């Protein structure tokens, strides 16, 4: 949007809701980053209201009940093979939200119920992830060096774009994506590897949402198959 302010896109709001365990420093830092991103985006008038970011503090059942009912899209984006099956995606499904996700956890069962044509699936399969881990052949730095957009986004983590008062605030997140430290492999969850596929899924959502007839049918079918 900054590069192409006249871009035709369906306005959207990304809603995050989570809690971090008391000693989970990276999770707390991630929440801090989400809020910093929200501050930048939500106060940028040049975006023209096309994009907003919201973080729900003190996420709990009473918050979730509102979000489940309001969401058009349920993002379930754990890396394939990494997530134990949860129930949040099922609650979104019961309320008719279409799933954007990987083939992981309960997403697999949801896609089996609604059909791949009524969901937006992206990313590597579990077998592909496991193969990369076994072969130890994934090099996120190659993506950083060859994808200008991803490189710019990551550099914003350490150049003060989101933290002018402390440019190094998000260094740990940056390092976790690019630098291997002892037993911690860089980009353990293949975030950079899956990103382009994720971005393409969002383009498909943008196109699908414009077809109100198709979207209504997909929502109705998703809701019915949840019962």
Residue ranges: model-predicted function:
Residues 222-227:
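Conserved small/polar residues in nucleotide/adenosyl-binding loops
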Residues 52-54, 76-79:
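Short, flexible loop segments at the rims of nucleotide/cofactor-binding pockets, characterized by
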Residues 17, 218-219:
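Short linear capping/connector segments at secondary-structure termini
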Residues 69-70, 77-217:
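Catalytic binding pocket for nucleotide-activated donors in carbohydrate/polymer assembly enzymes
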């Amino acid at each position: 949007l900054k590069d192409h302010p006249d871009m035709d896109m369906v306005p959207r709001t990304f809603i995050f809701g989570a809690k971090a365990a008391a000693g989970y420093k990276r999770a707390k830092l991630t929440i801090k980053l989400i809020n910093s991103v929200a501050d930048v985006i939500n106060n940028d008038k040049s975006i023209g209201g096309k994009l907003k970011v919201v973080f729900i503090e003190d996420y709990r059942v009473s918050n979730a009940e509102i979000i489940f009912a309001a969401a058009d899209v349920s993002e379930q984006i754990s890396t394939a093979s990494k997530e134990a099956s949860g129930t949040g995606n099922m609650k979104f499904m019961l309320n008719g939200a279409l799933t954007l996700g990987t083939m992981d956890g309960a997403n697999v069962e949801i896609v089996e119920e609604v059909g791949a044509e009524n969901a937006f699936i992206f990313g590597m399969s579990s077998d592909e992830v496991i193969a990369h881990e076994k072969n130890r052949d994934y090099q996120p730095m190659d993506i950083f060096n060859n994808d200008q957009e991803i490189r710019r986004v990551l550099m914003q983590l350490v150049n003060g774009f989101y933290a002018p008062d402390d440019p190094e605030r998000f260094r740990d997140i940056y390092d976790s994506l690019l630098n291997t430290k002892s037993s911690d492999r860089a980009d353990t969850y293949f975030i950079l590897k899956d990103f382009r596929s994720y971005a393409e899924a969002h383009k498909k959502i943008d196109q699908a949402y414009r077809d109100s007839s198709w979207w209504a049918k997909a929502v109705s079918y998703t809701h019915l198959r949840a019962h």
